[in-house]
From Swiss-Prot:
PANTHER family: TRNA N6-ADENOSINE THREONYLCARBAMOYLTRANSFERASE, TRNA N6-ADENOSINE THREONYLCARBAMOYLTRANSFERASE, MITOCHONDRIAL. SUPFAM superfamilies: Actin-like ATPase domain (SSF53067). Transmembrane segments: none annotated. The modification N6-acetyllysine is found at K74, K140, K203, K230, K299. Required for the formation of a threonylcarbamoyl group on adenosine at position 37 (t(6)A37) in mitochondrial tRNAs that read codons beginning with adenine. Probably involved in the transfer of the threonylcarbamoyl moiety of threonylcarbamoyl-AMP (TC-AMP) to the N6 group of A37. Involved in mitochondrial genome maintenance. The gene is Osgepl1. The keyword Zinc does not apply. The keyword Transit peptide applies. This is tRNA N6-adenosine threonylcarbamoyltransferase, mitochondrial. It holds the Pfam family TsaD.
Length: 414
């Protein structure tokens, strides 16, 4: 599990020669007349270097992304200094590609939006330092972006979704349920008490040595689990969902990881193989842990919907559940959430898979949303700092727990 600093960070000094070269290349007069507001979004919160230009109507004019997945697969996880160096090596190129694809010069931009919280400190610093130099050079407003708010609002780029709506954000670094009441108003109903589901699935995949599996060698851990689980029998092993007696909307995945690890150790002894070799029962284990994860996410989400309905926080006639984040691309988990949505008369919406994972489009779009609402637009960036740890919205999880809502049993026929 990656440990993040709890304090806001000063901006590291970037390689100025590269930025100057970038500025010289784009320090030209606007090449076209744009009638809409334009925002450049920059994302470096973890291990993806991404940028995009989006206009106020939601058109994506240009985008670019550099993924570090293959590098970190070899090390068994994200190494922050390595991620930082790769961001430094690629950020100029990625921003240039996004601008070039869009036909937009920095002079055409209405603002520059960049993720400054939460995330890996070393990674956040790279994006922020590069952005600050662009802001200062081209005299553009700066819009600091909360990474999880951007994930939550991405759905409004692809669908006509009004406020309020419920969002489940599930990824390798986050797991939370929140009610989105406006562009900047969030009520946190529950969150992971330990690790995120994507992190847990990655750890299980590493413990199963799926990188050595011929079908999974280039996949992330979560993708490998989903792929292998299709060949497995989830009934072969009993892995129970966590926190079944806790009547809140919080999550926990550490216990699920430990139970699975013990099961793998037991099967290794039973099959007479050493740690690091692939079990004959790997697919069955993958199927069982995926099912337990899906059931855990579904039950907490079910309770969140019931709470919002009881408190009249969601419109009964037009209730929407949005699921986003990297784990939202897991179709098995999505089917479990569809069962919950159908049982509660909610509409389940998910952004396209490429917008569920980290990307520059969601950052630019969040910038557009804030620009239109006149929220968080800075003209002085001298004191701006990144924040590796930053909660989402107002935490009302205690109120949810005190309601002690009993969730009716649903048949998870997946």
């Amino acid at each position: 599990m990656l440990m993040l600093s709890k304090t806001a960070g000063a901006i590291p000094r970037p390689p100025r020669s590269n930025v100057r070269g970038f500025i010289r290349r784009f320090n030209v007069q606007p090449r076209a007349l744009f009638h809409h507001k334009l925002v450049l979004g920059i994302e470096t919160s973890c291990d993806d270097t991404a940028a995009a230009v989006v206009d106020e109507t939601g058109n994506v004019l240009g985008e670019a992304l550099h993924s570090q997945t293959e590098v970190h697969l070899k090390t068994g996880g994200i190494v922050p200094p390595v991620a930082q160096q790769l961001h430094r090596e690629n950020i100029q190129r990625i921003v240039e590609e996004a601008l070039s694809a869009s036909g937009v010069s920095p002079s055409d931009l209405s603002a520059i939006a960049t993720t400054i919280k939460p995330g890996l400190a070393l990674s956040l610093g790279v994006g922020l330092s590069f952005s600050v130099q662009l802001v200062n050079q081209f005299k553009k407003p700066f819009i600091p972006i909360h990474h999880m708010e951007a994930h939550a609002l991405t759905i409004r780029l692809t669908h006509k979704v009004g406020f309020p709506f419920l969002v489940l954000l599930i990824s390798g670094g986050h797991c939370l349920l929140a009610l989105v009441q406006s562009v900047s108003d969030f009520l946190l109903l529950g969150k992971s008490l330990d690790i995120a589901p994507g992190d847990m699935l990655d750890k299980v995949a590493r413990r199963l040595s799926l990188i050595k599996h011929p079908e999974c060698s280039t996949m992330s851990g979560g993708k490998a689990i989903e792929h292998l689980a299709k060949e497995g029998n989830r009934f072969h092993f009993t892995i129970n969902p966590p926190m079944q007696n806790a009547k809140n909307c919080d999550f926990s995945f550490t216990g699920l990881q430990h139970v699975t690890d013990k099961l793998i150790t037991h099967k290794e002894k039973e099959e007479g193989i050493e740690k690091g070799q692939i079990l004959s029962s790997a697919a069955d284990i993958a199927a069982a842990v995926q099912h337990a994860t899906a059931c855990h996410l579904a039950k907490r989400t079910h309770r969140a919907i019931l709470f919002c309905q009881q408190k009249n926080l969601l419109s009964p006639a037009n209730a929407v559940l949005v699921v986003s984040g990297g784990v939202a691309s897991n179709l098995y988990i999505r089917r479990a959430l569809e069962i919950v949505a159908n049982a509660t008369q909610c509409t389940l919406l998910c952004p396209p898979p490429r917008l569920c994972t980290d990307n520059g489009i969601m950052i630019a779009w969040n910038g557009i949303e804030r620009l239109r609402a006149g929220l968080g637009i800075l003209h002085d960036v001298e004191d701006i700092r990144y924040e590796p740890k930053c909660p989402l919205g107002i935490d009302i999880s205690r109120e949810v727990a005190e309601a002690a809502i009993k969730v009716p049993r649903l048949k998870m026929t997946l």
